[in-house]
């Protein structure tokens, strides 16, 4: 089958960084083409060039043999190119239907026919297999539901080329299966799919071919993915072999550091209880909607508690106040780091120092020298890849943004408990191992760590103990010596947890 999408010698640089250098590869019509690489390898830059969001310094993109000269995202859209970014492009205050039909509403003489709009959108969503209320405000949807709306928007435009950037990072298993079925349908219709993911299982399941980028250059191009193995791809991504990505090792655990006693809230009505020992990494696993993130927000004080107590080293942590939780030694790295974790438009230095400024801001005046010293120290310690501490944090890869958030809390004096939600979502295999090493180092220093993840291999790989959540309650407690994938998944499923789970003693 003929080449339909071609990248020819694409180069793109920013001040202090060469993001892409002479990248060339092609994709056949009707193919699903994987794009992999470590964070910072150049994948997102290449996608931005394809989408018309940014222009390449040199090189050319061809679609069906025709050179493309985009000046804007609109130009790319008109050429049949749609990119679904990790940072969703929906308008929160508009409804699902309005977002899906934005700019092309049905009606006459400028008057929108809303009944026709709802009818058309309902029919198309049902046809695609997406169960979302077309009249619901996007702001009211979960992250996974918003992702499905974004995907539906691309499918409903009859695009010739669709690029998906980590599309399943916020999806449940059921939603992912719907997406995979859509991709198969688009493939059969001749649409080119550029599939950016760090999940090798998805790459091997969906893709016909694969390109690997490393440090802005073409590391490998595989026209037939069936002829390449996982270990080879990982080595091509990181430039070295990673024999054990998890790197777990036993540690000496201390006394109970974090104690949660019958805590509940509006979004987690059933009271839950658990303890985490000093030096322990406790994993929380469950399906989307199981209540994992809600638990973390209650413990941290971001959501209001209805009842219960949180104690650190036996001392009560005041309820409903992140500020007081931080002072008590409890910190949270949130699930959605783009919106809840980083301060967009601010530098790495400012993001790292934001929680510690009171320590070097006498009389309300920030000591910029101490702030710079702190940033440089943690950039080096956490191996943040950046040309300067002054760089805008939005220009960092996901893995480096996560390191900056960790650096923010490590710079805070007296942190005893770290709650980290989806620690490696959208992060490449090399950066994942670096994040895990940071967590192991913190645990070895006596910190109690709670890791919340929807990736079962991750939880099983790094946790000393796992609590499985199902429908807002703790359904099972499993020690590392008893880890079993089938048992954990069975406990996470609503129809199975009641008969297969072993409840922890702490739960009343």
Curated annotation (Swiss-Prot):
Binding sites annotated in the UniProt record for ATP: 37-44
CDD domains in the record: ABC_Carb_Monos_I, ABC_Carb_Monos_II
InterPro entries: AAA+_ATPase, ABC_carbohydrate_import_ATPase, ABC_transporter-like_ATP-bd, ABC_transporter-like_CS, P-loop_NTPase
Every ABC transporter domain range: 5-240, 250-496
Primary role: Part of the ABC transporter complex AraFGH involved in arabinose import. Responsible for energy coupling to the transport system.
Protein name: Arabinose import ATP-binding protein AraG
Location of the protein in the cell: Cell inner membrane
SMART domains reported in the protein's UniProt record: AAA (SM00382)
Catalytic activity: L-arabinose(out) + ATP + H2O = L-arabinose(in) + ADP + phosphate + H(+)
Organism listed in the record: Rhizobium meliloti (strain 1021)
GO terms of molecular function: ABC-type L-arabinose transporter activity; ATP binding; ATP hydrolysis activity
Family statement: Belongs to the ABC transporter superfamily. Arabinose importer (TC 3.A.1.2.2) family.
Subunit structure: The complex is composed of two ATP-binding proteins (AraG), two transmembrane proteins (AraH) and a solute-binding protein (AraF).
UniProt topology in membrane: Peripheral membrane protein
UniProt entry keywords in alphabetical sequence: ATP-binding, Cell inner membrane, Cell membrane, Membrane, Nucleotide-binding, Plasmid, Repeat, Sugar transport, Translocase, Transport
EC number, as in UniProt: 7.5.2.12
Main location: membrane
GO cellular component: plasma membrane
Pfam family, one: ABC_tran
Enzyme class at the top of the EC tree: translocase
């Amino acid at each position: 089958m003929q080449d339909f999408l071609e990248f020819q010698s694409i180069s793109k640089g920013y001040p202090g960084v060469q993001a892409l250098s002479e990248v060339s590869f092609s994709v056949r019509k009707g193919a699903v083409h994987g794009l992999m690489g470590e964070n910072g390898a150049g994948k997102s830059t290449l996608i931005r060039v394809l989408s018309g969001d940014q222009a390449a310094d040199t090189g050319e993109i061809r679609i069906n043999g025709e050179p493309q000269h985009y000046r804007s995202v609109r130009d790319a859209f008109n050429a049949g190119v749609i990119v679904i970014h990790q940072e969703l492009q929906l308008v929160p205050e508009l409804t699902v239907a309005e977002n899906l039909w934005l700019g092309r509403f049905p009606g006459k003489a400028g008057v929108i026919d809303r009944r026709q709009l709802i009818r058309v959108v309902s029919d198309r969503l049902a046809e695609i297999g997406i169960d979302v209320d077309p009249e619901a405000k996007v702001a009211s949807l979960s992250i996974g539901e918003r992702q499905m709306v974004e995907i539906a928007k691309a499918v409903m435009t009859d695009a010739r080329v669709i690029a998906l950037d980590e599309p399943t990072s916020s999806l449940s298993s059921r939603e992912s299966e719907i997406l995979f079925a859509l991709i198969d349908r688009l493939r059969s219709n001749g649409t080119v799919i550029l599939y950016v993911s760090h999940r090798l299982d998805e790459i091997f399941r969906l893709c016909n071919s694969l390109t690997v980028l490393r440090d802005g250059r073409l590391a490998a191009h595989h026209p037939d993915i069936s002829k390449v193995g996982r270990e080879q791809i990982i080595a091509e991504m990181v430039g070295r072999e990673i024999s054990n990505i998890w790197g777990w090792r036993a540690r000496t655990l201390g006394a109970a550091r974090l104690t949660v006693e019958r805590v509940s809230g509006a979004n987690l009505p059933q009271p839950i209880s658990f303890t985490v020992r000093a030096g322990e990494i406790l994993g929380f696993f469950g399906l989307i909607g199981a209540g994992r993130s809600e638990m973390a927000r209650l413990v941290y004080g971001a959501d209001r508690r209805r009842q219960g107590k949180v104690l650190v080293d036996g001392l009560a942590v005041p309820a409903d106040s992140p500020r007081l939780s931080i002072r008590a030694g409890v910190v949270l790295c949130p699930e959605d780091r783009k919106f809840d974790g980083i301060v967009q438009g601010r530098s790495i230095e400012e993001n790292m120092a934001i929680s510690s400024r009171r320590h070097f801001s006498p009389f309300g005046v920030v000591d910029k020298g101490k702030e710079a010293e702190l940033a440089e120290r943690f950039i080096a310690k956490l191996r943040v890849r950046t040309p300067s501490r002054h760089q805008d944090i939005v220009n960092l890869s996901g893995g480096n943004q996560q390191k900056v958030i960790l650096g923010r809390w490590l710079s805070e004096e007296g942190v005893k408990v770290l709650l980290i939600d989806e620690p490696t979502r959208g992060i490449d295999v090399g950066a994942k191992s670096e994040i895990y090493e940071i967590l192991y180092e913190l645990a070895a220093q006596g910190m109690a760590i709670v890791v919340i993840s929807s990736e079962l291999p991750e939880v099983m790989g790094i946790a000393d103990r796992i609590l499985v959540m199902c429908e807002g309650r703790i359904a099972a407690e499993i020690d590392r010596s008893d880890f079993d994938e089938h048992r954990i998944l069975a406990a996470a499923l609503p129809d199975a947890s009641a008969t297969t789970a072993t409840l922890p003693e702490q739960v009343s």
